[in-house]
Curated annotation (Swiss-Prot):
InterPro entries: Cyt_P450 (IPR001128), Cyt_P450_CS (IPR017972), Cyt_P450_E_grp-IV (IPR002403), Cyt_P450_sf (IPR036396). The lineage of its organism: Eukaryota, Fungi, Dikarya, Ascomycota, Pezizomycotina. Its cofactor is heme. It is found in: Membrane. It comes from Neosartorya fischeri (strain ATCC 1020 / DSM 3700 / CBS 544.65 / FGSC A1164 / JCM 1740 / NRRL 181 / WB 181) (Aspergillus fischerianus). This is Fumitremorgin C monooxygenase.
Length: 504
């Protein structure tokens, strides 16, 4: 396979001269760092190569070093951009402040203006549509529960079989297959949720996009608008998007004929149809709209479910109490959206896992669109990228023995009137920023919660699970991301007991 280093640019002398000009600009006109200390900025590291490498392999240690200074804000060079890291105490003040832009902070990092990585609406619509579409989906979750449960059952039976013998399975592959099938059912209906070609695209798009972004970001920013045309990961991503179009557009045409028909018929919710009607004739790319939503939805939910399953492998003492809760709650009330809300121990295990092992160690990214003076006098210069330190999740006053995993932690907190408001999994707080906070909080967290609980219900009632002997599933940290090892395995077998059938 072609490597990035093997690509030769024409006129290397021109490139070299351009780099010298940039170096001169840096030396003559250094960036305004304000009065904030920098944790990993080094003299003569003009292109921040050393700083970025340090962050890539020691991000958590660098973040902790900044917190140990006792300052409420400090600068940290990451492998993406330099962030002003703020302690979580500022999250409540900033969460809805329009002087800080969320999309303005994320879009340049994700290179959304490059073909294959782009947004899908002209003008400002491209950032308005995904949250609107997901919020519309949230209203349908109560009706979708039995359908999502059916897809979870189908996927698990296909991948894990009904074998009563212990056999090893991949945790990441299982979870990704489940999320792909269930989320496609939620977004696009029954037409595509078992389509192998579409599911392959849905499962791999997020990873392929991340690889393409990393490939482009390895080049200087002034070359990125051109170099992406020649990079193999970008070309492969554009081919995959075209394959997705070939699958989605015929489905969209059928949706259009249905909702434009003079015959009023009751139709299932379709994200394709919702976005098409929301556009009201505006030019947009229906395929990129769906892929953008999928890229976010899959990452959040897959990361959560993988880590919860890994925790259960490490804490098998939780499996039977969780199973008994499912039997008690779902056996009495049936498998409905409202009964999922009553699985408080399961929700506690999920939230405790997310508290200790969020997908990213910093969060709630914003860009200061103007100079901002906070209430305590802290001045944030215009153009500053900010992120929050996620430090309150280790506050011992809020979470006794915060470094220790306690699956019952949030269930016990429900008994404390002063802390009960912190317990719902989908509730955002400055002490728990895994889903963000404020008006830009992740709108897909409700779907993620329901999908995670449904998956766990099916696993707990139908299978025995355990860690592979001598090889417990472990996490792998890289930069700001903390993910389950892609090679993580577990052992499973079909249970003999069958308390009741999971159905709506």
């Amino acid at each position: 396979m072609e490597t990035f280093d093997a690509i030769q640019l024409p006129y290397p002398g021109v490139v070299g001269a351009s780099l010298l000009v940039i170096l001169g600009i840096i030396l003559l006109f250094p960036l305004d760092t304000g009065h904030f200390i920098s944790i990993n900025q080094h003299p003569w590291d003009f292109f921040q190569t050393k700083a970025k490498q340090e962050f890539e392999y020691n991000a958590a240690a660098l973040l902790n070093e900044g917190l140990q200074t006792g300052r409420s804000a400090f600068r940290l060079v990451t492998n993406m951009v330099t962030y002003l890291i703020l302690k979580d105490q500022y999250a409540e003040e900033i969460k809805n402040d329009s002087r800080f832009g969320a999309h303005e902070a994320v879009d340049p990092v994700l290179l959304v203006d490059l073909p294959g990585l782009e947004t899908m609406f002209q003008g400002s619509l491209h950032n308005q549509v995904p949250p609107m579409a997901v919020r519309a989906l949230n209203k349908e979750l109560v009706h979708l529960t039995p359908f999502l449960s059916e897809e979870a059952m189908n996927c698990l039976q296909t991948r894990w079989t009904d074998s009563a013998e212990w056999h090893d399975v991949s945790i990441p592959e299982t979870v990704l297959a489940l999320i792909a099938q269930m989320t496609t059912r939620a977004l696009l209906g029954p037409a595509l949720c078992r389509n192998p070609e579409w599911l392959d695209i849905a499962k791999s798009f997020t990873t392929n996009r991340a690889i393409a972004v990393a490939a482009v970001q390895s080049w200087p920013s002034f070359l990125q608008p051109v170099i992406h045309w020649f990079l193999s990961p970008c070309r492969a991503l554009r081919r995959q998007i075209q394959c997705a179009r070939n699958i989605l557009l015929p489905v969209l045409e059928r949706e259009r004929r249905s909702y434009r028909s003079d015959q009023p018929t009751k139709r299932e919710f379709s994200n394709l149809a919702f976005i098409d009607q929301y556009a009201k004739g505006a030019r947009y790319d229906a395929t990129m709209a769906q892929l953008r939503i999928i890229a976010v939805a899959f990452q959040t939910t897959s990361d959560l479910v993988e880590k919860v399953i890994a925790r259960l492998c490490k804490h098998p003492e939780l499996i039977q109490p969780l199973r008994e809760e499912v039997v008690s709650v779902v056996g009495k009330n049936g498998l409905h959206s409202h009964s999922l809300r009553k699985l408080t121990l399961m929700e506690s295990v999920m939230k405790e896992t997310q508290r200790l092992e969020p997908a990213v160690i910093i969060g709630m990214f914003r860009l200061a669109k103007e100079k901002v003076t906070l209430k305590d006098g802290t001045v944030i210069p215009k153009g500053t990228n900010i992120a929050f330190a996620n430090d309150l999740r280790f506050d011992p006053e809020m979470y006794p023995e915060p470094e220790t995993f306690d699956g019952y932690r949030f269930q016990r907190m429900r008994e404390d009137p002063e802390k009960i408001d912190l317990t719902p999994f989908t509730k955002t707080r400055m002490s728990h920023l895994a889903f963000g906070h404020g008006k830009h909080a992740c709108p897909g967290r409700f779907l993620a919660c329901d999908e995670a609980k449904l998956i766990l219900c099916h696993i707990l009632l139908k299978y025995e699970i355990r860690a592979v002997e001598g090889s417990p599933p472990e996490l792998r940290a890289r930069g700001m991301f903390v993910q389950l090892d892609p090679g993580a395995m577990m052992s499973v077998r079909r249970r003999r007991e069958n308390e009741f059938a999971l159905h709506g």
